[in-house]
Amino acid sequence: MSHIGGHITLFFTVEKEGRLLRNQGSRGVGINIQHGVKVELSVKDFTGDVKDSSIKIYNYQDQQMMNSDSFYRELIDDLVFARLLDESPSFDISISLELPTSQGFAMSAAGLIAVALACRQYSNRGTKDQYFRICHRIERQNGSGLGDVLGIYAGGVEIRLQPGAPGASGRSLGFKCNQPIVLVWQPEESRHTSKYIDDKIWQAKISRAGHNALNAVKIGPWDHSRWDDILDQSSKFCQESELASEPERHDFLDKVMSIVRSVKLQSHVRIRLCMLGTSCVLLPRKLDRMLSTEELSLLESQFIEQGLAAKITGIDYQD
């Protein structure tokens, strides 16, 4: 079994001009979260062809997602090509998503990495970096993510200093941060990353704002002392990129803020958009003032009562 937490990007640049997919990606800052993707892998037939593996995917509401396996079959083909898997046996692979797709929680990257590392547990071949590089390339090939694989590789609260795949041109750092947080999203909404990163106007706005934000935080140690800078720059990024001005996001953020005010927690939390969904994360304003279990439960129940979806999770650091 393999479990990989999701990832939230708080601000970023779009850097996909490189000829090689392994050098494309993004720079920026993000947070790894505990909820993500769980994978169970077992042998189906010891003499069977790996291409005949059974792959079942379940969404966060435990409903089977049909016709969603091509992504993972591409991964298995690439692992065989790289000699990290043999052409037999065939497998039974069950993939369970713990959060919705297309809401900025990196379910595609987490799913790929979870399946890749489950295959590595079985084959006991290659380095972790090799598997992450393959996952990054598939993400770029499908336009489903820029820096999620590199962010997950770093763990915790991460900064991506150079775009690309881990172990190729990509460079990222992460620090541990034991904090409960709350994810909130608009249930009917979903947005594919490519809508923004393939649009020249959005790409320019996002990258300009992302460069400004990153330049303000990249110098100096990467640790808890940067928390205020991260909160400040993620707020500025949302305004400068104009992502927070889109009507759906603007209305969504207003609704979230009014609920936070109604339970009188506005002085203890900061609301930040998750790139690029109609979703946000509630982060502690100060790391020495952790939200209590009661406060977390109150927030979650109020969001759900008001027609939003919410999940209590935590910042995650995987060694």
Model-assigned labels for residue ranges:
Residues 105-128:
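DPxDG-like acidic metal-binding loop motif
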Residues 174-241, 245:
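Acyltransferase
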Residues 223-319:
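Glycine-rich, charge-dense phosphate/pyrophosphate-binding loop(s)
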Residues 129-173:
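Alpha/beta catalytic cores of group-transfer enzymes, especially the acyltransferase/condensing modules
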Residues 2-3, 21-22, 30-33, 142-144, ...:
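Solvent-exposed alpha-helices and their adjacent loops that cap or buttress functional pockets
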Residues 43, 186, 282-286:
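Short beta-strand-to-loop capping motifs
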Residues 1-101, 124, 313-319:
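ATP-binding N-lobe of GHMP and related small-molecule kinases
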